[in-house]
Amino acid sequence: MDEAKETVFTKPQNHSSTLEFYDFVTTLLEPLSRIGKTRKSKTSNLDPYELKRKILLDYFNKWRQHVGPDLYPLLRLMLPDLDRERGSYGFKEFGLGKLFIRAMHLSPTSEDAKSLKNWRGSESKHTGDFSTMLQDILQRRAYRTFPGAFTVGDVNALLDQLADASSEDTRVNILEQFYRSLSPLELRWLIPILLKVRKYGTSEKFILSVFHPDAARLYRLCSSLKRICWELYDPSRSLDETETDVEVFSCFQPQLANFKKKDLHQTLEAMGNKPFWIEEKLDGERIQLHMSSGKFQFYSRNARSYTYAYGSSYFDEQSRLTQYIIGAFDKRISQIILDGEMVTWDPVLETVIPYGSLRSIFEDSSSHSSYSPYYVVFDILYLNGKSLVKYSLESRRRILEKVIVRESHRMSILPYKVGSTIEDIEAELRNVIQEGSEGLVIKKPSGSYHLGERMDDWIKVKPYYLQGFGEDLDCLILGGYFGRGKQSGKINSFLCGLRMDYTPKDHSEKFQSFVRVGGGFTYFDRDIIRKETEGKWLPWSSDALEYMELAGTKQDFEKPDMWIHPKDSLVLQIKAAEVVVSNRFKTNYTLRFPRLEKVRLDRSWKDALTINEFFTLKNAVEKQDNVSFHVNKKRKVSQKREKQKKFLYDEPTFKKEASPHSDVLKNLHFVVLPPTELHETKAGLQQIIIENGGLIHQGVGNFGKERLFLVADRVSTRVSIERSKNMCTIIRSQWVMDSVNNQRLMPQWSYLLFSKDEKYSWKTALESLSAKSLSNLLVELKQLDLSKEYSKISDDTSILNLTISKEEASFVGAFPFLKFTVFLDLKGIENSELYDVRMGQYRLTKCILLWNGATIEKDISSKKLTHVVMFVEDSTRLEQLTKACELYQIEPKFVNFEWVVNEWKKASTNILG
């Protein structure tokens, strides 16, 4: 099968116009919202679900009778969050509030306007609940008090215009039409539709099941509300087997991992007490890849298309992914659907780094960041016209490993380990904690793929806390954040801080933001906090900054909705998996997986952990070779525990006053990260640095020092973050030791993980460039006999004559292609009979060019372009590229693989003498 199957469904024709919007509100939404979850209605013996089903079914039948079989206009308003056909409106609560201020012609200084602008922190009785606040204002300022004449179709038409609006003025005009045409009751229900949320307490699964028995199943297959309404408009029609499988370019709802069990024993039981697979839970975005005949589509878990970012074909020059995975699939593959996680790859540090903050880079095709998207595949659902969802995970994995024949840091298969015991899981948890990973996913090898379901076939396990940090972090509540949905208007998570240090005579009443915690609270915990702090919460204002410091130049990072005076606050005892670096909090650190241990009513703000105490505790914990942890505190471990060391806050980790043994590290500033290759503790290396004149810092911060070194022996999340800031040189601990032992600062190139000074890095590269390394590469080149496979495109093989200064001469001598800017043309490689050879030539060419200082461009439009390298002899393609160069007014030299190799050999011979 060469082409993707195209699902065709015809729009059913309605015989009359749609029902009135007021009827939709009063006959359907209002009755549904009044039904409780458990209690029976006073006017009916039906239980809540039966009553809701009756209301829905009656209205659906009424629509079919009075309007026709097409219920799509109706379901778009009932399930606005599932409507993928209508684009985003471009606003959330704050933006909608600003638009309604203009639509209602409110004075910006009026109390209602101020409340809408500051809906989270106003003094209104509806603080934190935007929908109710706006409804209250619309009720009091109603333009009309009687039902409007708008139909469901009229509302949909205006919403389509709103989604397509390109200016704020247009949006305001549309909202003003709603304001003038609808009654307060209708506007009340319009607001959640605009925010794409549901406020009538009924799930989409339940609504779809009433609409049609197969609707929920079809939605899991296609994520299209329109298709459901048009394909299943007849309630008596059932889907056949051929219509219940995944299809290429039809976005399905992926299987999700179930939540953790109470303990790992239950996880083993869910696996049937049989061997299971352990996979790393990646920090990225769930993405499904669809490919048919070289055409691609990428979809997120929420059915959003990311094809514009990741690429629509192998030859999409704007793509961040597809143009780099040519040859990744077996040549026999014409159609495929993959399930995986899109993460971020740092090619300089050669590691995966935190994804969320970098997603915008991938979405912006003009971005020139060195970071790249990296698709990590863990499942295959479709292959060459056949659905694989009913196959076991084990079978799907075997197929996947045969399908992907070339892995790279653009796309690869997620590895797994086989386990059978709790100890196997705990061992892997220790590994992911050390690597700063999200956690694990435990999978049943015999399980099939369940579209859109959370099943016990996949269970996620996260490291909930380390014993070393779990009992000792007593943090003070500084502020609170309102929840959403059912938690609107209620504080459901807290900003906690560490107390700034004080002298014995002066208690500091000022704190620095440290962690946001919302997990681990029982009903009773929240009730205690509510009672103890009732009447003491204040809307956020600059007054709070007298008592606390937030991160950010404007002190607005993680800004809470409400704040509380330290003397009125409570201490929370928090447990966590680990301490991690974060610029979102003033301390520059925060907790990973924070959870409440208990509310400490026996402690006051004066007893909260100070910043110095925290760092002393952190350093002491880092001394331990192995920090023990438990997945759940309630599970008793049947082994003897070593008595936990009591950490003394007044014992320094290292002696700052130690007299220097030398001044070889004088005026150099260091931040040391554990673990180091040469020392059991971070403190040991710090001591050596101080003894030899170096200065120690606990964080990189914004020192602005030219010679700041971050000492690290492995790439970690923190190293990646600091590298992205470009504030310091990241170097291995061996450099410190070799410099001390030789009593001189050693050349840094061979020790570097990253240098903030690019020129310095090149110069040190020259220092380390040896004749031996060049000779070895020449030997490898001589072993390649490729000269007969490709005729030369250009007869002129002389190197482009470039004028360079005397100062550059020695530099360019070692890097003969330094002045070259090159475009590597991959067109035609995938269809070449010598595919493997051509890809080998491509990789070697890229290696030679980069090794010798050339710049490689991703497209041919660069004004600096000096050379174009072609790997397939194609006169038509050569003509296309020549015309493109004329269009861009550039005159690069067209060469082939052999030309690059020959010129490099000549240059290398000159260097070697």
UniProtKB/Swiss-Prot annotation:
The active site is at K281. Keywords: ATP-binding, DNA damage, DNA recombination, DNA repair, Ligase, Magnesium, Metal-binding, Nucleotide-binding, Nucleus, Repeat. Mg(2+) 1 binds at E341. The keyword Translocase does not apply. Disulfide bonds: none annotated. GO terms for biological process: DNA biosynthetic process; DNA recombination; double-strand break repair via classical nonhomologous end joining; double-strand break repair via nonhomologous end joining; nucleotide-excision repair, DNA gap filling. Its EC number is 6.5.1.1. Interacts with xrc4; the interaction is direct. Belongs to the ATP-dependent DNA ligase family. This is DNA ligase 4. It comes from Schizosaccharomyces pombe (strain 972 / ATCC 24843) (Fission yeast).
